[in-house]
Amino acid sequence: MAMAMAMRRAAALGARHILAASSTSSSGVLLRRHMSVDAGAAMEKVRAAGLLRTQGLIGGKWVDAYDGKTIEVQNPATGETLANVSCMGSKETSDAIASAHSTFYSWSKLTANERSKALRKWHDLIISHKEELALLMTLEQGKPMKEALVEVTYGASFIEYFAEEAKRIYGDIIPPTLSDRRLLVLKQPVGVVGAVTPWNFPLAMITRKVGPALACGCTVVVKPSEFTPLTALAAADLALQAGIPAGAINVVMGNAPEIGDALLQSTQVRKITFTGSTAVGKKLMAGSANTVKKVSLELGGNAPCIVFDDADIDVAIKGSLAAKFRNSGQTCVCANRILVQEGIYEKFASAFIKAVQSLKVGNGLEESTSQGPLINEAAVQKVEKFINDATSKGANIMLGGKRHSLGMSFYEPTVVGNVSNDMLLFREEVFGPVAPLVPFKTEEDAIRMANDTNAGLAAYIFTKSIPRSWRVSEALEYGLVGVNEGIISTEVAPFGGVKQSGLGREGSKYGMDEYLELKYICMGNLN
């Protein structure tokens, strides 16, 4: 019940609203008219490729919701309805779980090489449909097309990587304590996995979970965000085309509370993997306790970006800009607080503002766009709440600070100065295009300020000093640290946080362990 209430609140918060002001402004009307033409052509291209799916996937079959209900998938830039997809609930989820459970035994018995070949084919199909997937992603999520293309490649990289790692799931032989014994450790797939994924990276967050799960021999029930199900469904369609068997991947979307509760209550689901808010992650963790499921959680962040006075300013500007404004600030590893040493604060602020001014806000389908809309009206209202809180406590708006003239859920790239630790911008994740600048005096002050949070996902530091880079990296209470770099995620490195930013790791060889169980075998009386 608590889980259902939490997910209902999250769904209510994320409800899409169309701004009355934008519907009456001439610029808003022109924007929607222009984007409608682009969106129509893009959707037709996706449809022609056979990748526009609106039904759920259960046991290899595309099925409607059992009660016939649907939900709208909207373009966040225009409010237009892109498609109506099946609104599924507990019954459909239970059937998806049953399908995954029955398929698990045959899929897990395949050789690692056989699973690897199927995954490799899936990777190749994703790459061959790179443009269509990117178009779909831009339409339903809003990110610029160039970022969407990068995400397709990034998402596919997990499939490729884990296709190879499938053949490297090694056990152990332990030296015995008695001469007539042999001690072995096997690694075996955990079973059916429930994967709950977010809207900000609608492809990569699926492949980062489903790739290792399938490589290990697990089967999966995916619950994508109701805001971005089309990308997930297209990816699942390509998985079927690649020869991944019916039932190995199932996709259900719609009624988040019902789907979540069905996954948690099922004894056949042996693992939950989730990327999303800390609040919902805590509910999933608590709900998993009743059936003692294995849990992986990649939760919210509050990333500090520390710029020391010995940093290369150009490198720091470029890295901070990338760390902050990618996907319009809607990533869990976004620089949420930019801490700048007092000696270079004014110089950095001036150069940073100039760089932010160069960001082009607009239609994600246009080549020149570098900043798309926020996902919905609720996201804009959250940003406004944080800005109002900061200015009421003494912060000053150095750039932006208001809704964009394009209307809808567009927000101006914003820089806020003199932010202090009593402000929401310092304490919580804004998840929008707002860069708070915070001055600090010493290295010790920077470390203390950076660690003054319950979150611990990503952190960034900019310095020319190698000793300082080691000291600060080791002192920061974060799972990921970028040194003189603002984009650090890769399929070959472990991704995950500490403290209340999550449990477990995704990507890399360490990500495989999240989907495996250890089995110890003692063979006796061998003399």
From Swiss-Prot:
PROSITE patterns: ALDEHYDE_DEHYDR_CYS (PS00070), ALDEHYDE_DEHYDR_GLU (PS00687). NAD(+) binds at residues 208, 223-226, 276-281. One of its GO terms (biological process) is gamma-aminobutyric acid catabolic process. InterPro entries: Ald_DH/histidinol_DH (IPR016161), Ald_DH_C (IPR016163), Ald_DH_CS_CYS (IPR016160), Ald_DH_CS_GLU (IPR029510), Ald_DH_N (IPR016162), Aldehyde_DH_dom (IPR015590), Aldehyde_DH_Superfamily (IPR050740), Succ_semiAld_DH (IPR010102). Pathway: Amino-acid degradation; 4-aminobutanoate degradation. GO terms for molecular function: succinate-semialdehyde dehydrogenase (NAD+) activity. Redox-regulated. Inhibited under oxydizing conditions. Disulfide bonds join 332-334. Keywords: Disulfide bond, Mitochondrion, NAD, Oxidoreductase, Transit peptide. Residues 1-35 form a transit peptide. Its main location: mitochondrion. The record marks 200 as: Transition state stabilizer. The active site is at 298 (proton acceptor), 332 (nucleophile). It catalyses: succinate semialdehyde + NAD(+) + H2O = succinate + NADH + 2 H(+). SUPFAM superfamilies: ALDH-like (SSF53720). Its EC number is 1.2.1.24. It is found in: Mitochondrion matrix. GO terms for cellular component: mitochondrial matrix. It is an enzyme of class 1 (oxidoreductase). Substrate binds at residues 208, 326, 332, 489. Oxidizes specifically succinate semialdehyde. Involved in plant response to environmental stress by preventing the accumulation of reactive oxygen species. Belongs to the aldehyde dehydrogenase family. Homotetramer. PANTHER family: SUCCINATE-SEMIALDEHYDE DEHYDROGENASE, MITOCHONDRIAL. This is Succinate-semialdehyde dehydrogenase, mitochondrial. It comes from Oryza sativa subsp. japonica. The lineage of its organism: Eukaryota, Viridiplantae, Streptophyta, Embryophyta, Tracheophyta.
